């Protein structure tokens, strides 16, 4: 099984962000945790602060991967381009957010991109990624 894990803007700076909201692991530690918890799955990790690069990865994901996990960061509230790319992507897709968005600012309540995924997980820090992988394994059987 091959899973693409995409991370959007500012997730490369997790070590500088509020640990109460985002957890205490930086992106490389999250990637290591994922590989340790699911050693039989082939993961490709990609992070970009650029919307177009994320769109390019999504557009080709269903050619090379069995599933997609995406944390679009702030783009989840604003990006029609990512929304549209997700709509065209024909593999299971789960959106993950480290922080508990329902407890955050009003502008974070509208998840444009999540509407084109199979579901989203919010508020469990790095464990949200593990939960998404668990669900993908169940979906793909």
Predicted segments with their positions:
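Short, glycine-/small-residue-rich phosphate/pyrophosphate-handling segment
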Residues: 45, 94, 103-141
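Extreme N-terminal starter segment of soluble prokaryotic enzymes
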Residues: 1-4
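Short glycine-rich anion-binding loops that position phosphate/pyrophosphate groups of nucleotides
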Residues: 9-11, 73-76, 99-101
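Short beta->alpha junction loops
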Residues: 44-52
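Short, acidic/small-residue loops that bind anionic groups at enzyme active sites
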Residues: 88-102
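Short Gly/Thr/Asp-enriched flexible loops that form oxyanion-binding sites at enzyme active sites
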Residues: 79-89
């Amino acid at each position: 099984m091959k899973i693409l894990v995409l991370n959007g803007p500012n997730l490369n700076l997790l070590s500088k962000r509020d640990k109460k909201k985002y957890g205490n692991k930086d992106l490389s530690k999250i990637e290591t945790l994922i590989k340790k918890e699911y050693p039989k799955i082939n993961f490709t990790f990609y992070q970009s602060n650029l919307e177009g690069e994320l769109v390019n990865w999504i557009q080709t994901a269903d050619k090379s991967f069995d599933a997609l996990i995406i944390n679009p960061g702030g783009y989840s509230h604003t990006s029609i381009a990512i929304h549209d790319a997700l709509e065209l992507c024909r593999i299971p897709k789960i959106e993950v957010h480290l922080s508990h968005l329902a407890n955050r600012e009003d502008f974070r309540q509208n998840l444009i991109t999540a509407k084109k995924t199979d579901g989203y997980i919010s508020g469990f820090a790095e464990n949200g990624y593990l939960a998404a992988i668990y669900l993908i394994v169940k979906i793909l059987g």
